[in-house]
Design a protein with these regions (language model features):
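Binuclear metal-ion centers of metallo-dependent hydrolases, dominated by the metallo-beta-lactamase
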Residues: 212-227
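Glycine-/small-residue-rich active-site loops that bind phosphorylated ligands and cofactors
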Residues: 23, 60, 212
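Residue-level marker for buried hydrophobic side chains located in beta-strands
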Residues: 22-24, 53, 76, 156-158, ...
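Active-site HxH/HxHxD metal-binding segment of metal-dependent hydrolases
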Residues: 32, 40-120
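Conserved beta-strand hairpin/beta-sheet module of binuclear metal-dependent hydrolase folds
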Residues: 1-42, 149-165
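Metallo-beta-lactamase
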Residues: 28-30, 83-141, 145-216
């Protein structure tokens, strides 16, 4: 399955092809036009986009969604457990850093933005069959309460912020598996990582850095510090 990766200043956005194109995550506030320009370079017009799917409700992942919806008419979908974050236009104050880099980055994270009302919310999993891909999201809480990943039929996994790659937003050693910068629940995060490692995937496409080879994730998970 063809995956288009758009690397923005704060986070990655992915496009996958169903009946129409599906945009997974939307970057930070103001990133909508950059996503559309990148899509156009691949011959994708706004009318070709049929869904905006959010892996979770942090501002660096939903910030551009309203702009994308206004330009494409595509609905926005997110797990119900993160609905309040979108409606309040904020990141949760309960975010806890997983290491020094997360502590250093906290002051620079976008903490508030314009509230967003999604078009669709889901409990558990979201079925993408109506959009032309025979798969469902998998709920992987920990980074956020509603964090979800998307396994694709060909063995790729759109993994959001379940892990990150390398350092400095993936600019340094971007294919090295590392824990996310922040979590809301460390125990849930550890359980979700194990759940995702049980999915039939060979490559994880993540929000910061990547992609990550599953064999590298498994090797790294044998040592302390990944979850």
């Amino acid at each position: 399955m063809h995956i288009i990766t758009i690397r923005l200043s704060l986070a990655n956005v992915f496009l996958v092809r169903g009946e129409r194109w599906i945009v997974i995550d939307s970057g930070a506030p103001g990133d909508g036009p950059a996503i559309l320009r990148a899509a156009a370079r691949h011959g994708i017009a706004p009318a070709d986009i049929g869904l905006i799917l959010l892996t979770h409700g942090h501002i660096d992942h939903f910030g551009g969604a309203a702009e994308l919806r206004a330009s494409t008419g595509a609905p926005i979908a997110v797990h119900r457990a993160d609905l309040a974050l979108l409606r309040e236009g904020r990141n949760p104050t309960s975010l806890r850093s997983t290491g020094l880099e997360g502590q250093l980055l906290r002051p620079f994270l976008p903490w508030r933005t314009t509230p967003l009302e999604p078009d669709m919310t889901f409990e558990g999993s979201f079925d993408l069959s109506p959009f032309g891909i025979a798969t469902r999201t998998v709920h992987t809480p920990g980074h956020s309460a509603g964090h979800s990943v998307l396994p694709l039929p060909d063995g790729n996994l759109i993994a959001g912020d379940l892990l990150r790659g390398g350092f400095l937003g993936g600019r340094l050693r971007g294919r090295l598996p590392n824990p996310p910068y922040v979590v809301t629940d460390a125990a849930q995060q550890a359980a979700s990582l194990q759940l995702a490692l049980g999915l039939p995937a060979h490559t994880w496409h993540i929000g910061h850095g990547g992609p990550l080879a599953v064999e590298h994730i498994r090797a790294r998970a044998k040592r302390p510090g990944l979850a």
